[in-house]
Amino acid sequence: MGVSVDVHQVYKYPFEQVVASFLRKYPNPMDKNVISVKIMEEKRDESTGVIYRKRIAICQNVVPEILRKSLSTLVILCWKKVSILKVPNIQLEEESWLNPRERNMAIRSHCLTWTQYASMKEESVFRESMENPNWTEFIQRGRISITGVGFLNCVLETFASTFLRQGAQKGIRIMEMLLKEQCGAPLAE
């Protein structure tokens, strides 16, 4: 089945400032779930000017203990051995393509942990707003699918959907705070 989460936000700040804040967003005391972010690869295409980055984020396992125990019990009943939900941290991989000339950045991320049971993918874009060239539009679509755990698929997907929605809103609040701290008040219309 799977669940999707869509986010759309206009930041009243120029593209360059928004992207710089995004790249510095984590770790942040406002979101304790993101423990660290490490750049694994960064390169510039000399012909296009596009900057490619691959980053790995280490995040706390946010699956509630009751769901971890329920799933472990179900897995034991099904004669399968799985302790993957008991891990303290999960890893996310993020790839981004920043095109400074066209003032856009595309981002794709996915979960590296739990791939046997879950698929979590996000696609995001930062781009110059059509409303005002000094503003930046952010569009994100996330999708989670859980498989292999029977009736708990739906329970875990519902939890994941709620967590993703709340996480997206928290991410927007963090971005707004960082932009205001680093760049001052938002630009007027």
UniProtKB/Swiss-Prot annotation:
Please name the Pfam families in this protein's record: PRELI (PF04707)
> Which biological process terms from the Gene Ontology are attached to this UniProt entry?
phospholipid transport
Q: List the disulfide bonds.
A: none
Q: Which domain of life is it from?
A: Eukaryota
Gene Ontology CC annotation, any one: mitochondrial intermembrane space
Q: Which PROSITE patterns match?
A: PRELI_MSF1
MF-aspect GO terms: phosphatidic acid transfer activity
Matching entries from PANTHER family are given as:
MSF1/PX19 RELATED
This one is known as PRELI domain-containing protein 2
